[in-house]
Amino acid sequence: IVFTNADTSYVKKILKNLDLINIFDDIYDIERMNFLPKPNLQTYKKLIAAYNLDVKKAILFDDIPQNLIPAADLGLKTVQVYNKKLLKELNGTSKKIDYMTNNLKEWLQKWMLNN
């Protein structure tokens, strides 16, 4: 499931560009969040309830460190997708980050092979 502050049409373009369009089952976008974006904790809780997610088996990827904090607090694994600029912004959120990558597609491929 893609959990995004963007709209579905934009996300589909990005996923297609990254050749990840067939990896995800659904998109939980800003409209489905009732325009209450991440990192609002209630939005994460609604996502978990909407899909009956087992947080112990769920992973949240995000390029914004602050969006990983509520996910970690709820028990999800977290992956920081970064570039050099974002590395400077981590400021203490690293305790809430389980993994880091600068290549989402590569990370997903490795994860899927090993799990």
Which stretches of residues belong to each language-model region?
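Asp-based, Mg2+/Mn2+-dependent phosphohydrolase catalytic module
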Residues: K12-N115
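Conserved phosphate-coupling serine/threonine residues in phosphotransfer and NTP-handling enzymes
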Residues: T4
